[in-house]
């Protein structure tokens, strides 16, 4: 199976080339900057394309070996596309506040996940709440909701991930530090105010615009699905004869590709530029 296809035109239309104001740049991003316009740095997408391709290759290789991929992005505009992409490719995500020790103190996190499962079982079992007062039930409901917000995306991970994909390295600095401490490779979108040396596979690009974030997440998810397909083929399995979960993944990939193609052609570049410019003007793409 082939890697997900993408073009520089798609990156342009999504506004991936818009950086931050020139005075807020990180000098380490100098080699990835094409120039500036209206005091906004413009990212060199001719470098983004090959680096994004390298990242997708790494994702596919990891998925083909049965590895776990963790999507991380807690800023508001990344939360929904991140969760949707991770769910579509049967991987894991954290889109709320990163809990310190999520990776380096996995045993404690596992205990919290066990508690979440216990609460879910109580609510699913008709007699699980028997004998509890309304106040006690309300407290348990709130506890379950809080745990689900924080850990729902990783409750089925079963251990630390083999690869981590990050949106906004500045905001997710703790997550990156934990991954590096454990030797977990990190793929990340690096904007003009980021340090590309902190990650193993930097992808120069806008990490604030919603359309850009959705594009990155979808490409990573498609690469995971490709890797899963390669794994099935390597085992000599006919995908047409595979079990329902694999069929669901392949069908989901086909649907997303079919929907994304016409959308990319119809979306005017001017709209993407305006959206990205608006994002930059809001306190210069304030880091959430």
UniProtKB/Swiss-Prot annotation:
An example molecular function term from Gene Ontology annotations: structural constituent of ribosome
Instruction: Write the record's keywords in alphabetical order, separated by commas.
Output: Ribonucleoprotein, Ribosomal protein
Q: Where is this region: Disordered?
A: 259-288
Q: Which GO terms describe its biological process?
A: translation
InterPro entries documented for this protein? Ribosomal_uS2, Ribosomal_uS2_bac/mit/plastid, Ribosomal_uS2_CS, Ribosomal_uS2_flav_dom_sf
One Gene Ontology term, aspect cellular component: cytosolic small ribosomal subunit
Q: What SUPFAM superfamilies has UniProt attached to this entry? A: Ribosomal protein S2
Q: Where is the composition biased (Low complexity)?
A: 259-276
Name the HAMAP family on file.
Ribosomal_uS2_B (MF_00291_B)
Which protein family is named in the record?
Belongs to the universal ribosomal protein uS2 family.
Protein's UniProt name: Small ribosomal subunit protein uS2
Organism field: Maricaulis maris (strain MCS10) (Caulobacter maris)
Gene encoding it? rpsB
């Amino acid at each position: 199976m082939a890697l997900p296809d993408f073009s520089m035109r798609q990156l342009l239309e999504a506004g991936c080339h818009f950086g931050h104001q020139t005075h807020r740049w990180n000098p380490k991003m100098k080699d990835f900057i094409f120039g500036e316009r209206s005091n906004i740095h413009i990212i060199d997408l001719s470098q983004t394309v090959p680096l994004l391709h390298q990242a997708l290759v790494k994702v596919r290789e990891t998925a083909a070996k049965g590895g776990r991929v963790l999507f991380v992005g807690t800023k508001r505009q990344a939360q929904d596309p991140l969760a949707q992409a991770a769910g579509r490719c049967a991987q894991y995500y954290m889109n709320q506040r990163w809990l310190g020790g999520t990776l380096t103190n996995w045993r404690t996190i596992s205990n919290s996940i066990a508690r979440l499962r216990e609460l879910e079982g109580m609510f699913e079992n008709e007699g699980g709440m028997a004998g509890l007062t309304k106040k006690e039930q309300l407290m348990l409901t709130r506890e379950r909701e809080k745990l689900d917000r924080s850990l729902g995306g990783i409750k089925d991970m079963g251990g630390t991930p083999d690869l981590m994909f990050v949106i906004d390295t500045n905001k997710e600095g703790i997550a990156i530090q934990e991954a590096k401490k454990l030797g977990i490779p990190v793929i990340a979108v690096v904007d003009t105010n980021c340090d590309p040396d902190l990650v193993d596979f930097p992808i120069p690009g806008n990490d604030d615009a919603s359309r850009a974030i959705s594009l990155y997440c979808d490409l990573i998810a498609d690469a995971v699905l490709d890797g899963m397909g390669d794994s099935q083929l390597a085992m000599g399995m006919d995908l047409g004869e595979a079990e329902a979960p694999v069929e669901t993944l392949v069908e989901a990939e086909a649907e997303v590709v079919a929907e994304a193609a016409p959308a990319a052609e119809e979306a005017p570049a001017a709209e993407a530029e305006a959206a990205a410019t608006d994002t930059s003007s809001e306190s210069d793409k304030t880091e959430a």
